[in-house]
């Protein structure tokens, strides 16, 4: 496969011509914040947190192919501002606190918040007191907590290749994942649980 040379944050990187900026960065140990990326899934660009700056223009790195001589900045004043807006919207709609969450620690949302330097005081201000949404524990293999879900759709896209037992119901801020309980076609592979980047899906 043809190779191209580009620079990411000043570091010269050689990548396959068919790869994306995100993949090139990921393969070279360069962190770009993300919530909806999983290595064996087609990039969806849903979270948009992986935005970078290319020659002064902001692009979504998981959907933008590399080019010869490309100059990429994973952080810039504009990228940081837009990324902070996106993550603060997520935090504001993320009902649950991190304390006591079984997903705390490896949580991709926590990692991104730390990268953008959103501290606990800011989190408390962003999260208004909301009525907790009921957990879905109808599936015999795992529980789904919509209060922790960031709608990355990794579970949906993973299951599409196996049983298509997951869907999205509702729109906008009322959207949530649906697993259909005992009537589901779920085969208990639990790939959705393993791949959840937050604590929304937990094995029973």
Which ranges hold each PLM region?
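ABC nucleotide-binding domain "signature motif"
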Residues: 6, 52, 201
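N-terminal cofactor/phosphate-binding cores enriched in small/glycine residues
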Residues: 14-67
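Eukaryote-biased recognition of intrinsically disordered, low-complexity regulatory segments
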Residues: 1-11
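Fe-S ferredoxin-like electron-transfer domains
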Residues: 48-49, 57-185, 194, 199-203
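Internal gly/pro-rich beta-alpha loop/helix module
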Residues: 188
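Short glycine-rich loop/turn motifs that provide flexible caps or phosphate-binding loops at active sites
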Residues: 9, 17, 44, 169-171, ...
